[in-house]
Structures are given as C-alpha cells and as structure tokens.
C-alpha cells in the first residue's frame, strides 16, 4: 500500500538515516565538482535493503549492492548538477501539492502520511527534500529531451495499422529487465564483451538463479535496485526491440540478449494483462451565458448583472434570448449560448464540475471561472462509445513515453561520458 511513499526515499540518497553523523566523512566518489560520502552511501544502502526485503526479493551480496547503489548515486548527482546549472527550482507549494497527491493515492490524510513516514525512520523535512529531488530530476529530464519528443498522427496511424496484424497487441505486459551497458560509441571488442556478459547472465538464470537478484547486482538500468521491475506496460510503450519479443513469449520466459541503444538487455515476462475494454464516455449538450469585467464593466457590476439575468431566467425569461442579448462569449451567444456536445475534460474544471452536477434543463447559479461568471444549462446527455479515439490517444501517449524513455537513457549516457567520475574507494570500483 505504501510502496510509493517508501520508493521516494529509496530512489534518492538524502540523509534519511543519518544517525551518528561524523564531523569528518569519508569521500567514496568524486563527480565533477561534487563528492559522494560514505554516510550518503550507507544511508542509501540501508534504504535499498529495506526495499528489497519489502518486495520479497533475494538480498544480493553486500559488496555488490554497495557498488550498484554508488552507481545510482552518481547518476542522480549528475542530473542534480544539471538542474542547478539550468536554474531549475521547485517551490514549496509544488512539494505540498505532490505530497497531497501521494497521500490521496494511498488513501491517507496528511497526518496519517506523517505517521507512516515516521514509522520508516524518516523525518518529515527529509522526506520533503527527497520529494524535491525527485521533482527536480523529472523537470531537468523534461528540459533536456522533452521538447524533442514529437509523435505525429501518421506515426499513431502506422502503429495501429501494424498492431492490428499482431496477435495480442492490445494486452499489457509486466516485464523485468537487466541492462549490460555500452558506451556511446562502443568498439567491436566492447560489444563482444558486453554480449558475452549478457549471455553468461542468461545461462545463470536458466540454471535457476534469481532474475531480480541478478538485476540488482549486475544491471545498469534505471530500475536495477527494484530488481529490474519495469511494471506493466502497453506494447506501444516498449522499445520496438522488446515489443517484437514479448508478443511471442510465455509468462516466466526470459529472452535475450537484445541489443538496444544503451546496451544489451535480458527481459523476463512476469505477467500478461487483460485486453483493453470498450471506452464509453458521457457527452453533455450544454449552453451558457458569460459575463466578465471589462473596460465598460467593473467586477461588482458584472456580478450584479449575472445575478439579475439568473433571476430573470428563473422567472421565465428564455435562456437563448438572454444569451444572445447579454453573453460576452461571441461564438456561442449567436447560437443562444449553445456550446454543442462536449466531452469530459474539454471545459475548465469549475465549469465542468457544476455542469456534471446539474439535472437536465435546470440553470445553475452564477459560476466563477478564469473567464468570468457563467450561467449554465444542460440540455441533454448521451453515452458514446469513444473506444477508437481513446485508443488513438492512448497510443500517442505510449509512443511519447517510449520516445522519452529512450531519449533520457541516451542523455544519461552522454552525461556520464562528459563527466569527471573518480571512485576513490577502490573496493567500490
């Protein structure tokens, strides 16, 4: 239930378990002008152990885990440096909003949330700092590659056309993966060594060794410390080289080595989800009258006038005639305020919330939005099978996510290639 709460602190170093800090802390690695200390590493190792236990995964060897955790901290540090260089900041109000969403998703209020965090040995301030770090990294990734992620209508149509010929293309796939990394421009020898390493791991798995433990020990992937668990993905979200494999795999099967841009991959199919169901939406036929302050009408006059119009309609005046006479939404005023049939999410939240709560043919009291004051009337409602449009929108989002993940991986690889990284503690090299 509280996986998301724990995960935030498992992802980032912070000082979540900083008891007994020493005045002089040993440096274990140098990353450009920054250092990673032994206390930071120890704190992250302890958090990773807790996460491994919570997910019922086999605990890897201590020395191997420390090496993997350090590599993770290096990646995080590089991205935090980029956030600082780009002047990216997170306001306290944004952190508050993020925490409220996490609490709500776990069916907790903020007081209960604090209690759960405290039970994990983490102070509220430290938890907020880790949330800030997570948001910073997300934002710097968006700034670095997000603007280049474009999915065209042609790409969506082409995917749907191709997927239509693939059996089980509408299913979801729960995968784990192990990544054996490659440099940006690997030599033939480096390619051979990485492929042999991946093949050796595959042989270990075939002989019965635990996939998740090997992912924690050996993978360079983003989800290595979670046992390589990618979660449940739609086919369109997966790299094409993965998608071609998974549709032919059986649950429990491991495939690879698969060559991708950032290295050789082993993938395990954990489970297959059900086929997407029909998507039915409620459309609303709605009309409105808009009054807003302008050069000729101060706010108090706008409020006074919209209330006066409301009273007249309640007394029997025709809504359409009043809209034509008074509404400042020119496009709909000529049609008696008619906005036509609207889909969920097309109108601003305050308007839509009131609209959805109205019985048919009942006019709302004045509603304030960013555009001004509205009187709203629902003329009719109907159910519409929106499956095709919904599927296209889903595919667009999945393709965007696929491109984003691949772009972030390439960007992270480039960051490492351009950075000065010195692992001072040779036991961790």
Curated annotation (Swiss-Prot):
PROSITE patterns on file: PPIC_PPIASE_2
Cysteine pairings via disulfide bonds: none
Gene Ontology cellular component list: outer membrane-bounded periplasmic space
Domain of life: Bacteria
Top-rank EC class of the record's enzyme: isomerase
Compartment(s) of residence: Periplasm
InterPro entries listed in its UniProt record: OMP_Chaperone_SurA, PPIase_dom_sf, PPIase_PpiC, PPIase_SurA, SurA_N, Trigger_fact/SurA_dom_sf
Domain commentary: The PPIase activity resides only in the second parvulin domain. The N-terminal region and the C-terminal tail are necessary and sufficient for the chaperone activity of SurA. The PPIase activity is dispensable for SurA to function as a chaperone. The N-terminal region and the C-terminal tail are also required for porin recognition.
Annotated protein name in UniProt: Chaperone SurA
Source organism: Legionella pneumophila (strain Lens)
């Amino acid at each position: 239930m509280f996986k998301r709460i724990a995960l935030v602190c498992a992802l980032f170093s912070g000082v979540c378990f900083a008891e007994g800090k020493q005045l002089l802390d040993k440096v274990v690695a140098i990353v450009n002008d920054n250092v990673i200390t032994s206390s930071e590493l120890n704190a992250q190792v302890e958090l990773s152990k807790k996460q491994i236990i919570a997910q019922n995964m086999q605990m890897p060897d201590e020395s191997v885990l420390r090496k993997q955790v350090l590599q993770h901290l290096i990646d995080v540090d590089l991205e935090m440096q980029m956030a600082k260089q780009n002047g990216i900041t997170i306001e306290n109000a944004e952190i508050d909003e993020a925490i409220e969403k996490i609490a709500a998703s776990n069916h907790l209020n903020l007081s209960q949330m604090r209690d759960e965090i405290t039970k994990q040995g983490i102070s509220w301030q430290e938890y907020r700092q880790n949330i800030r770090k997570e948001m910073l990294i997300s934002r710097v990734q968006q700034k670095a590659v997000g603007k280049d992620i474009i999915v065209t209508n042609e790409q969506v149509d082409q995917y749907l056309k191709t997927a239509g010929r693939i059996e089980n293309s509408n299913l979801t796939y729960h995968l784990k993966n192990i990544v054996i990394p490659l440099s940006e421009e690997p030599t033939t020898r480096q390619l051979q060594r990485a492929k042999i390493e991946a093949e050796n791991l595959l042989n270990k798995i075939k002989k019965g060794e635990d996939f998740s433990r090997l992912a924690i020990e050996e993978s360079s992937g983003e989800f290595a410390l979670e046992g390589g668990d990618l979660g449940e993905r739609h086919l369109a979200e997966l790299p094409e080289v993965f998608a071609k494999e998974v549709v032919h795999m059986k649950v429990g099967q491991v495939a690879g080595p698969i060559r991708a841009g950032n290295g050789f991959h082993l993938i395990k199919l954990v489970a297959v989800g059900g086929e997407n169901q029909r998507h039915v939406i409620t459309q609303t036929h709605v009309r409105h009258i808009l009054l807003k302050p302008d050069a000729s009408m101060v706010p108090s006059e706008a409020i006074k006038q919209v209330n006066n119009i409301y009273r007249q309609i309640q007394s029997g005046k025709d809504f359409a005639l009043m809209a034509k006479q008074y509404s400042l939404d020119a496009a709909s005023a000529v049609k008696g305020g008619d906005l036509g049939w609207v889909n969920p999410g097309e109108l601003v939240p305050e308007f839509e919330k009131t609209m959805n709560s109205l019985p048919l043919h009942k006019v709302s009291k004045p509603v304030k939005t960013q555009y001004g004051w509205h009187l709203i009337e629902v003329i009719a409602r109907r159910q519409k099978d929106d499956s095709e449009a919904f599927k296209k929108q889903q595919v667009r989002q999945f393709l965007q996510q696929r491109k984003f993940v691949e772009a972030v991986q390439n960007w992270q690889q480039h960051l490492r290639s351009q950075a000065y990284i010195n692992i001072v503690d040779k036991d961790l090299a």
